[in-house]
Design a protein with these regions (language model features):
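Conserved alpha-helical substructure of the radical SAM core
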Residues: 1-117
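Conserved radical SAM core fold
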Residues: 20, 74-76, 100-105, 118-136, ...
Length: 191
């Protein structure tokens, strides 16, 4: 029996545990972990693509596969764009989660050329609150990254992890998100 509905098949992949920030609420402890090599990652992408094809053939199902790439901070991997290209070549839609600090215009353009469907950037509130949580200088750098993404037409979600430090900042964040021109504003679990 075959169905015409394509089932979403998504994987969130933490490509690295490394991060350029040390956020108060983050479970990433800044410890050093051995990362998969580029060849190991490419092999895993191939295996996942083959598995989806086998399931499709065996069960008569259609899939809409995607990877959401995150970390740590995925832009700390020098081979990030090689990885994204390999995912795209295997038919995966691409999404990223980032703190936005390392996203310059060139990176935003490359993401757009790859057809990235969306990037989620974390902002924890207005500047003072954001920098209390994420570190000095991170607010303006994240806003700059968001601006580059918006300029390329990539859909951007601003995400705020709610806590006692920023819980009163929800309404200012709605205004900020609107002013930034982002498509979505999300709120993560209370920590």
């Amino acid at each position: 029996m075959s169905t015409t509905k394509a089932f979403d098949f998504f994987i969130q992949w933490h490509l690295t545990e490394r991060c350029n920030l040390r956020c108060r609420h983050c479970y990433q402890e800044g410890r050093s972990f051995q990362e998969l090599s580029l060849s190991e990652i490419l092999g895993t992408i191939e295996e996942v693509a083959e598995m989806i094809t086998a399931w499709s053939d065996s069960y008569g199902l259609s899939f809409s596969p995607s990877f959401t790439v995150t970390g740590g901070e995925p832009f700390l991997r020098a081979d990030l764009f090689d990885i994204l290209e390999a995912m795209k070549q295997k038919g995966f839609e691409l999404f990223l989660l980032s703190n936005g600090v390392l996203i310059d215009r060139d990176k935003a353009d490359r993401l757009s050329q790859l057809g990235v469907k969306g990037v989620q950037v974390s902002l924890e509130g207005p500047k003072e609150i954001h920098e209390t949580i994420r570190g000095a200088g991170s607010f303006s750098a994240s806003l700059e990254g968001i601006g580059h993404l918006v300029a390329t037409g990539i859909p951007v979600t601003v995400n705020m992890t709610l806590s006692k430090l920023n819980g009163e900042s929800v309404f200012p964040m709605i205004k900020l998100a609107k002013n930034l021109g982002v498509q979505r504003l999300g709120f993560s679990r209370l920590v």
